[in-house]
Amino acid sequence: NVGTVQSEISKPSTTVPEQPSAPDDQPASGVSSGESSAPQDTETSKPQTASPAETVEVTEEPVINEDDAVTITNNGIAVVGTRALMLYGGSYSVGEQYAGVVNKFKEALGSDVNVYTMIIPTSCEFYNPESVKAYCGSQKDNIDYVYSMLKNTTGVDAYSALKKHVREDIYLRTDHHWAPLGAYYAAQAFAEAAGVPFKDISEYEQRVVHDYVGTMYGYTEDVVLKNNPEDFVYYVPKTVEYSTTYYDYILQDGKIVGANAPYNADFFIKFSDGNGMAYCTFMG
């Protein structure tokens, strides 16, 4: 039996943090008013254990144009050229809380269940130009720190798997999510760690929704993102058809006030070009 906990490492910032002053042995900081703060805990030192991603064999470096125009919004997003990056401001104390929750899962499930956790770095870890790096902490340092605190639980190294493919479309430019291809590489890393079968990507049919503009335009209203849509590429099994049960409901003041009867329909919904809901065509 396998228990899995997956986490993306940051969410949209809704508040403006004060500028931190981190010690030399902490992840980089230096965010001015309007950006997410980098890790700044001083009560916890960095782990001395070997980090999971130290053995990364980088096949390619990301293509970063240092001359691209950079705009930093007041909600912690940097628009670099035609790519939007959510600035990372995690902390070791939050990492400790997360590791504690995972350890409690393992304790509750017992020795008969293997528990895995896989923390996913966001795109700013790989695609920041030098002018933006000072505004972000190291996600790798924080991931390694979380994994060092796990007890009888396996931390899956998705970081290395993604870093090997940074010149491929593993993250979306106009959305805060990763792309389905990035999710595929991370899932492959999990399958290897768990020792479970995993199909080659050739077993899937590639589909494309053109002119996709994702959540980052909604967060920033930056016209550069709107005028530079991207292809949303996703993959569906060639030999298996999936359906799911849907519920439509009405929310009012955070409460469900109406719903219809459940109905079955295709899992992979076909959206037209330019439809911002295209991300719903896959589960990452």
Question: For each predicted feature, which ranges?
Answer:
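Extracellular glycan-modifying ectodomains
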Residues: 1-284
